[in-house]
């Protein structure tokens, strides 16, 4: 049968595709076929929003053009017939003009690495196309499907607030917490209230937007016909009528129906499932209809969830409240269901038929008694969605030929009450741990139960109803006895085995009770409002807040920084909030990342083949099936390596595993083929047989088996025995700190291009470490380093994850290019990246602290254990830094810290922002908080009492000079109004039984330098051209931290020329050799001094010409020097002086200086669910004399939010066999827009120049991250209040809270009558779903 032509529009241009393949996504088509690289691949599963585009079509049922955002990574091109696609390139560019959305995110400093920026731009653009004057709430909701790992979200929201009709300036009324008039303080120096000037923004003019393609508009009344698209393996049929659809289903009962592809697309990509026949019913009117009937509202099964949501919102606004109880429950679930990109395309019917056991909506539909209409050729039936509808895992009552035609969501009746609940790891766009729909119907005029439905997701392999429990409650009164009986019944009926998939067994069981208790209280409250209190009892006022749905105030933020001195030249940009130099290009999609480089004509694609066993011998590798895949070129392995297969920082790694694998994800080989799709299929065809060996997975396993790398590391000072003997109190404890995935938005990527002579090869790499990439590739190929050129334009984030681990990809790709003689490209998929490349080290610490009754610490002993993985990588240096930071900011006269590196069968863990420091400091604050509790003293008082003073020696004997921490502490106490708010928190906790607040203030001291002395060096190369323009190169790489921008500012001041004359193109090994990695927060310090040195050389050469022509211009002096045959090219070099520490003698300076900061955070926890919200954070940070306040504040906020993820949200789950469960944004949750503090206030400490760094600045990348521990300990403070109330224990009780403080840990720590009903016994031989590594 002949395939049809696919016709759609992209940015106004008509596209006619004669060979549309149903397996091709819009993202792949845009990037590879149309060359539109602005739309990015971040995850491939619709979870990050980097691929967001706007789709527009004429909706025949609504009779209007509709615009909606969508994830291009999931949208099959075959679904786009007669659709207009708008990408970031289509709304504006630097060559023409930026769209106001692009301009505002750039100028408000909302783009750092820039990889997420195009997707965020398109989410905002789509919102404005539908709502030119949105509310701030609508703006925040528009980004529920977008993630950013760099900025901390604040500048994005602040920039886009200028579009809001309820945002921006308050007109001087002072009624806005962000009022600019409130920000100007009476200081001796001028503080700036704004990082950008909104009045300079281009106004939004909706009339100037591109029009919908007239050709598509003319087709709106043309009858649709069935379409057929044939791919390599899959056929796609677009049915145009219901009859066609039913006939197709009868002919092909196994065909999959696809509307949004948000489920099937995931199964095809990540579960390797193949569906040869796909039928799309999206055009069929009956499946898209919305009908208001006498019993409820019916939605066609293909209705997008966004239509369901809008319809129900309208109904709730118009109908009596009593009639819309169910609607409000559905809306509460849809509120957190997913991002706009998913809700705009995912269908309500697809959500039901997918039959997910953790569905957000199915428990609600089941509890409401929703009716489903099922049809097949010749039959039609209506069934109620009850406990029989899902007979098993991912199964429904539908026969193979049947389809779901519609769902009727019922109106609620008089005396009927309904609630819906969901608890996930993250509030926004997250898969539920437990969901529930609950309904009760009372006999008229009474509180006697006539019907009760309690339905749950996440408590079995399907959506279930607690029938035994509910049947027992019929005819009972809505009173305490019923509550107790239901809770006892649920605990018994919904019991989970200890090895249940998904884990968190006690938490999930407790949630079933907590949800019912909330429902019970909500109904009690409503009955009271209806004057039925006498029949059911009165709601305790302290319980009332437990019934409140989550609400968040509009974001409020303050940024304070010291303005440049009066008289500073307008051209001197040092100290000014200059936007990131690439921000405009990033916002328009023009910035080029590694995978954006146009494909070479003869380019090949590579896919890694990795181990599925944690520890095993390789018995055989069979590539016969891989070779059958079209486009297959070769398989490479250790046997193909021409040089050395030994690699890694410590020479304990291999490029490819040869005889044995030592972790799941260990690279065994790679498949090379003509396209990424073919390489993926071929890689799946490689069959490996293993002989399994015993594996060590956890820190406890390593300790038990004495599995360590190297000897014990130790720092010791004072007389520990004497210190403990003199202490009034001694407390011992243990804390575990989980690992963290880097989750840079751009995964690892390398393009290797063989040059065809003398072994030369050019590599384009997303790496922080050009030198190691060069040397590792050269060693593997057996050629000198001078034959390998490594080039880095920019990275889409790094955070330490691309310091060493990028080489595991680069070496494999280089070998493939060497073997084939052709360019080879590899960009890891998100799941591969997370599986292979490691992350932050998990730590286990055992501590013992001695202290006086006054709170003064006199002795400390801490044993640190880190889970290193299967190779050492940078782990020793990371442990060393943890030991250097085990004091945080506190003077401890007698101290001993030890560190052991646990050798395990996990992928090697590596550098991550903070580099061991955050782990060491969290442990310190853990025992410090316990000192305060034991002494019965305010925590802030104990912390202040133990702080170092100017001139003190640390435990590693480095003298503290320029110790600004006390100033940061006092400023933060004052600006946060700590003491007044502490009283308010205490008052709130007395008045609220089931919600508690906590407040905490935390300091940080972070050492600046590589602790390996020889790395503290940098080079720069500066070319001045005869037109006066300057090309600058330095050894640092740009990953969003603004390093290139700062270096241009440094050069601009040094040369006394505008920044517009200076350009940085890239970082490469053939311009600046032997570079240190861009890491340790020192890149601006090191490279800034090298740039300065190069500038001084040029200035010295130009000096004679300036003297000859003092009134001349820069160009005049440059031309004169050139004519006089003077070199206009110079190198610069810098090394940090006086560094070098000895562990043997505990002497020498490991650091050049320290950065300091203090944060105060307030949180509110829901004791029943473990949910929490971050109410407010105040930060005071010492960054010296800021080179660029906008970039520095962005680093403070971004680091803080990344720390917020580390300490409260991000959790890696490994199976007992060492396989990572959490391999993408659907299972691993980084902070989202809604995760940040509602009030976020950042102040840079004024008048604190740092004489040890370029232009008196300070490092800023890593130091602020630990300040997020203020949220962790505020949560612990709130839990303490809950435990004191519900257990009757003394507030001096010590309890353990490991990091991260997830909802599970918070809820389980809030011990109460519900948790005691849900304690699961774990049999000795039970193998849990996940283990703590």
Swiss-Prot record:
Substrate binds at residues 803, 881, 915, 1011. InterPro entries: 2Fe-2S-bd (IPR002888), 2Fe-2S-bd_dom_sf (IPR036884), 2Fe-2S_ferredoxin-like_sf (IPR036010), 2Fe-2S_ferredoxin-type (IPR001041), 2Fe2S_fd_BS (IPR006058), Ald_Oxase/Xan_DH_a/b (IPR000674), Ald_Oxase/Xan_DH_a/b_sf (IPR036856), Ald_Oxase/xanthine_DH-like (IPR016208). SMART domains: Ald_Xan_dh_C, CO_deh_flav_C. Detected in milk (at protein level). GO terms for biological process: adenosine catabolic process; allantoin metabolic process; amide catabolic process; AMP catabolic process; dAMP catabolic process; deoxyadenosine catabolic process; deoxyguanosine catabolic process; deoxyinosine catabolic process. Key enzyme in purine degradation. Catalyzes the oxidation of hypoxanthine to xanthine. Catalyzes the oxidation of xanthine to uric acid. Contributes to the generation of reactive oxygen species. Has also low oxidase activity towards aldehydes (in vitro). This is Xanthine dehydrogenase/oxidase. The lineage of its organism: Eukaryota, Metazoa, Chordata, Craniata, Vertebrata. The gene is XDH.
